[in-house]
Structure formats: structure tokens, C-alpha cells
């Protein structure tokens, strides 16, 4: 029987994706490590790998493969938070009719049966980096508009109307964004995509 040992995730939700690691341990100190790539822009669980009793180097290499490219901090999560994320993003796969990645028998029970009072909004402070600068906030929200990320737009605006606005007919890719300060708290965002 495996017991929860620890979990951590990147705080990169504002970029549309995050990495999640859940580490389990049994009474004989055997480790089972689960690595999930969570995609909020329509894929749900985008990638999954597991390692049984990895060496420290193997675990580190897989963590860096999953999380290194985000350039984000890694934050500790509780068992409840980490299992909620697997269930939440895994259910997106069903909603968008996308295949579950990797050996789904290792996590399908979490998706189908894990129950909690958590909501994705309750986790935003952990899974999103703190944004202190106005231009940085504009850049992130521009990315969310182009990606049709209604969930983030609703969270940050508090408005269904803004969350349902879009500037592309399908999820787009942001190529560049130039933000000009026009003074008095006004900005112009010039965006080729």
C-alpha cells in the first residue's frame, strides 16, 4: 500500500500549463513517482510518466524534463490539492474527447472517483505566480485571451462577459506582444498572433 509522501507543481498556470509531481512511498521505503503535464487550454492531462523506485538522478532528470522549461517556481501541494488537480484536468480530457496519456490505469481512479470541496479558483494563488507589474499582467491576460482561457479570464476579471470575449476563432499562439504605456493607467497592447 502506497502512502502520500509529497507533491509539488509549477506556479505557471498563467502560461496555460503546469507540471505536477506526486510522490508515494510504502512501508519498505519504495517510491512511486507520478509526473503530469496539465494543460488548461483544451488538453487536460497532456503527458504522464511514472517511475518506480527511481534513483535521485532519475527523479531529478524527469522533474527537469517536465518542469524545467516553465521557468517557474515549484510550490508544495497537499495530497488533496494534488489529487484534485489530477481529477480536474483529467476530466477535461473527457470533456474535450482527448485520450489520456501514458499508463492511465495508474491514475484513472483518481479522475473518476476523487471527491473534494476544492475548486480550481481556490488553488489559483498557489498555481499562478504573483504578478506585481501592470505590463506583466497585461502580457499574461493577452496570452489568456489568445488561448481562449475563459477560466483564467473569469478568475482575474470577475466577469463572465470578459471571460467570454475572444479575439481569435480558435486557440491561437501569441507570437509577440508590445505594450505601450499611454499614461494615467492606460495601455495599448499590440499583438501579432
Predicted regions and their residues:
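Non-catalytic terminal/accessory regions
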Residues: 1-193
